[in-house]
Amino acid sequence: MYKSQAKYFEDRVLPVKLCYLGNTFINVSKYYQGRLKENTMLGAELINDNSLAADYEIISMVIDCMLSAGLTEFQVELGNVAFFNGLLHKAGITGDSAEELLRLIKDKNYFGVEELLDSLNIDDTVAKALLELPQLFGGTEVLEKAKSLTDEEECIQAVNRLEELYELLKNNNYDKYISFDLGDLSEHAYYTGILFHAYTFGTGEPVVNGGRYDKLLGQFGCDKASIGFSITIDRLIAALNRQNIHIPHDANGTLLVYNADRLGDAINVSKKLRSTGVNVCMIEYKDSKSDSQYIEYAKESSLVNVAFIDDEYASDSVSYTH
């Protein structure tokens, strides 16, 4: 997908905004590598914009999506991989050691982090900051704590970005959905800045994953900063079901019930209704079913009208039951 984007938008000067819906295959767990599961993913991307406003637009969109789905109790957890990367650069940790450290911090394995750091010859101040990472989660106090751990410029800029983003979210009443986790890292090396996940009750995995990947498209010849997210629809539906959330939606449409010998008339009526913007569902009338059963069927299908076409009605005349 990113290779196609890089080629198609290579010459674009202004930002590009995309959305997508499709099925993907993913490894469901690190314990079952190679065991793929199909998930439906809905997502959005903002390409060629590395601004704070772009970060805000994407995060606020995530919150709006969760609210629109009917969720009220959820958290969007924000981090910034640049903080971790800055500590790695200052300590000179690379290769397998860097990968192992990332994994341990991501898993909140405090003692594993401590053991690994003890085996490395690095500055005590940097080691202390890295050891704190698995515990750097919570409210805005986390950001103050993070800034007190290091004077590394890359790390300070990473925290400043989170603070500025939070202020924008707070000014627009999104702050109650926000928490922070500077130890929430990703095994995907292409993330370069803001990283986020959205969690709610009823699912053990994040419903939303996303972040900033400013150098990913550059690997395909299109050096454009990007940020985006994906909603795992399967997890979202599971959470809604387990929280007993039923989303009301605007019912619009007609159930067209016709006798077998009036199929042609029913088709003509459906064409006329559809031409006016009405959704139409056609079904053949069976003597074994009562009118009330068809009306109930329409209600279950979120159709507001039932039209019976039989010998009593001409092809351009229908009877509606609300």
Language model: regions and residue ranges:
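Short acidic alpha-helix initiation/capping motifs at coil-to-helix transition points
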Residues: 76-79, 105-110, 157
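Single conserved hydrophobic/aromatic residue that forms the stacking wall/gate
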Residues: 1-2, 322
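Positively charged, Gly/Ser-enriched RNA/tRNA-binding surfaces
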Residues: 4-12, 16-71, 117-319
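Short, surface-exposed recognition loops or helix-turn segments adjacent to catalytic cores
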Residues: 73-84, 101, 179-184
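Acidic, His- and aromatic-enriched active-site or binding-groove loops in soluble protein domains
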Residues: 93-112
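Hydrophobic mid-domain F-helix/FG-region of cytochrome P450s
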Residues: 61-68, 82-90
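Glycine/aspartate-rich loop-and-adjacent alpha/beta segment that forms the canonical ThDP
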Residues: 106, 319-320
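Short, conserved phosphate-binding/catalytic loop or strand-edge motifs used
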Residues: 37-42, 78-86
